[in-house]
Every structure is written in structure tokens, then in C-alpha cells.
């Protein structure tokens, strides 16, 4: 299993799409996994969830579990599977449960 590190993100994490701020958080977590770029996971309370529609996409990571995906509703049109969340991740990454990450 690759080494996975989860730490509080420093500063403010902001997600923008189509000119709109979709998320802004000082409580985000940064997940670093060997062989992958770091990923910010943002609490749902810091996300404009009205911009996100659940999609039918599900993916599985052997180290984190099953992810549900979301389409982003933007002025310019939907952005398919723009975000994902591990609702019930494996114990080793339980800190990201229910948080949302964006591509």
C-alpha cells in the first residue's frame, strides 16, 4: 500500500468554475498519496452544494474505498464528474469521509 498522508491545508482553498466561487474553505484537508498529485478535500459546509448534482459515476480506490461523483452545474453548462467524495472511506483515510474533492 502506498503511503497516504492527510494534513490540514494551509491558507484558504478556493474552487472556481464559470466565474463563480463554488467552494472556499480554511478547513480543507490535503491528501498526499505516493505517485499522485496532492488533493484537497473540502467540508461540504464550505461548498455551494447547489452547484453539484450527484452523477451515476462510482469509482473504487483500493486504498480509500468507493467514491461517488458529482456534476458541476455552471453557467456555461454542466461539467461532468467534476468532483468526488468518499462517503464511507477505509479506516486509514477516515478523516476525508463526506468531504468533496474537485478535478
Please annotate each region the language model reported.
Residues 1-103:
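Terminal leader/tail segments of proteins
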